[in-house]
Structure formats: structure tokens, C-alpha cells
Amino acid sequence: MRLKNKIAVVTGSGSGLGKSIAMRFADEGATAIIVDVNERNMATAVAEIEARGGKAQGYRVDVTGQRALRDFMEELVGTRGRIDILVNNAGITRYRAFGAVGPEDWDAVLGLDLKAVFFCAQAASTHMVRQQYGKIVNISSSLGTGTTPHVGSLSAGAAAPYASAKAAVIQLTQILARELGPSGINVNCVAPGFFLTPLTGAARNPQEVEEHIRVRTEAAVLKRPGKLEELANAVLFLASDESSFITGETIRVDGGRTDRM
């Protein structure tokens, strides 16, 4: 097993991409620490992992709170002894017409999609530095490397807060890699393309969701959405010792997007 006896924290892992990552980790021998604000989703994820014979524990944590994160990491280390892996997956998106995007949209999206990534890494790395070992994987997006297609009433500018945050995560990954590398900590990033998740139609007009799916699918060379296990496999590689000489890198898991700019 590639992650035998590892303690792996995955934020936003009660559903969607995060849940698939946590389940993959547990399949490979890790104890998956399910971090989510939705207690029902969190409990369901833990139960599903345990039903497959894996190990998991759930924590309800608001990852936008620096003090809450520090307390959570301290409690986890006190219970489990260490933190080996952190996957910064928690995120939100808000799509509004370009002219309707307001300060509250920027604050909400950057608060979770960027600031929380930094503070999670900061809190976890305190313990990883003591261990002289750790793996941090940040989840960015293909929108961090290119623009979103214009669909219906929503132009590229509708995703400005989300895309900007995800682009910043790629740069933050390099900064953290340089900062933490001397302490034996690898920091890498995965930029997913189009996957069908609960965020697919988030904040979109229901009539535009089908067109959104078509346009995003056509933008990929493989002409299909990604499968959750395909993303989880990429994250698993970066979380395992198979990637021990890789740090500061971003792997695009996007089916070959042709609309990058």
C-alpha cells in the first residue's frame, strides 16, 4: 500500500473531488481525516470509507479561521501523533454576470479558495517541520491557467474571483515549496479540468448548465469530463513517496484543454 499508516488530512472532503481523494487515500492504507463544514456529508464520507475496510475520522472545521485551524491541527497531532499529508481541496465558486460581481464575491471566494490554502499549510507545516517530513497538495483549477468559455449570459469575467484565486494557488504552491523544502516537505499542485461535481452548476442559471457542460467538454482533447478517480490518482501520486523529488510543480488533469490562453 502506497500510503500505509499515513495520516492524511483532506479539506472539503465530505463530497465531490475531496471525497474521492480521501477514499483513494484510505484504499492505499492511510487514515483519511475528513474535514468539512457539512456534518452530514462528513459523517457519510467516514461511513463509506469504513464500509470499504478503510480508516477515517471526521472533523467539522471552518478552514477560513486561522485559530480554528491551529486548534484542529494541535488536536489531531495530540491524538494521532503526526500529520503526513495535507490536501487543500476546500473551495467555492460564484458565477455572476460580470457587471454584478461585487466585493462580497471576491471576499468569499478568496477567503476559502486562497487564504484558507495558506493558513491550512501554515498550520500543518508547523508539525511537518518537526517531523522533517510532509506532503502538501493544493487543488487549483484549469481556470487558474486559462479563461472560462463564454456560456449564455456569463462571460469569462463572471469567474474572475475564482480563476484569480486558483491562479494565485499555483504561485503560492511554488512559494511554499521554496519555504518548506529544506524541512523535507514537498508542496505540489493539481489543476483539474472539467469534472462533474456539485459545483458544476453552482450559481448558474439551470438553463445554462447543459450548455456549460457541452462547451467545457468540447474544450478538452479527450472530449469528455474527467472521472473523479482520475483526479484522485494524480493527487495520490503527489502525496506518495513516488514523487519524493518533485516539488513546486502543478500537474494539469484536464483532458488536454485546448482553450488555454
Feature locations, PLM:
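Conserved glycine-rich cofactor-binding loop
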Residues: 7, 14-16
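The beta1-alpha1 cofactor-binding region of Rossmann-like NAD(H)/NADP(H)-dependent oxidoreductases
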Residues: 39-40, 59-71, 103, 229-230
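Substrate-binding pocket helix/loop in short-chain dehydrogenase/reductase
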Residues: 97-98, 105-110, 150, 158, ...
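Active-site helix of classical SDR
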Residues: 121, 165, 173
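Short C-terminal tail/terminal secondary-structure segment
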Residues: 146, 197, 236, 247-261
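Short, small/polar-rich loop/turn modules that mediate ligand/substrate recognition or access, typified
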Residues: 181, 186, 246-248
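A conserved structural motif in NAD(P)-dependent oxidoreductases
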Residues: 220-231, 242
